[in-house]
Amino acid sequence: MHEMSITQSVVEICEKSAGGRRVLAVTLEIGDLSGVVPDAIEFCFEACTRDTLLEGARLVIERVPGRGECTSCGKEFPVRGYFDPCPACGAYGMRVVSGEELRVKELEVE
């Protein structure tokens, strides 16, 4: 489960950013195409925050839907995977516009 190491990295990033202050809430953006399972992050969060500045912090996860832009016709459309065809022209080449995000969006500290 790579979500455990991802959650540990999130905790480290938040602790550095908090500057020694207790963290009350963390907001993460997780894209639907990122390969990260939000439920698994939630499951790991309590264990990873034990005895840290984040212990007891609230975790908020904002999902970012996948969107692509067709490289043939330029149409932007929702995607669930990297090989979805363009709904306008049927071509398979696309550029991902959103959905690969995995970032700490907001940190609430004391």
Curated annotation (Swiss-Prot):
Ni(2+) binds at residue 2. Gene3D superfamilies: 3.30.2320.80. The keyword Zinc-finger does not apply. NCBIfam families: hypA. Belongs to the HypA/HybF family. Involved in the maturation of [NiFe] hydrogenases. Required for nickel insertion into the metal center of the hydrogenase. This is Hydrogenase maturation factor HypA. It comes from Geobacter metallireducens (strain ATCC 53774 / DSM 7210 / GS-15).
